[in-house]
Amino acid sequence: MQPTISSMVGYTIRATDGDLGKVDQFYFDDEAWTIRYVVVKTGNWLSGRKVLISPVAFGTPESASGTLSVKLTRAKVAGSPDIDTQRPIYRQQEVELHAHYQWPWRGGYGGTFGAIPLPLSVDEASSEHESSGPERRDDPHLHATREVIGYHIHATDGKIGHVEDLIVDDENWAIRFI
């Protein structure tokens, strides 16, 4: 199935032991053209906190019921690192997130599962980041889908149109069409 991003906004995210919340938006990698995270608005059970979940944990979206199951527990999600989804997501935050969930690395600087091994520890990643000198802390290839829907597309000879939606392959979470 190839659902649109807009059709999945509002889907219920279902953990193994109950509902987590609703899909707020997605983050994608503009080099690999894959979904890297879903932003879940948790509602009352976690004080309205928004959390990031990788497609590594996704099941298949069920369009009839508007649900997306994930292979996580509510307790695991509640203990996840607090990331402000209104600000750029920093590489260090991604390292901490992947370490918490024990997910393989996905996207950025490689774009596929396992392209870059997860550091042995968060401390190791911190010291490596500090010693590498000044560099950009956020990932310039990570974008919110809400940010790009509506973008105008231009060719060398004029305007083509605008981004209405993104169509994804729900097996590998690659963006297939815009």
Regions found by a protein language model. Give the residues of each.
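Peripheral interaction segments used for macromolecular assembly
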Residues: 1-178
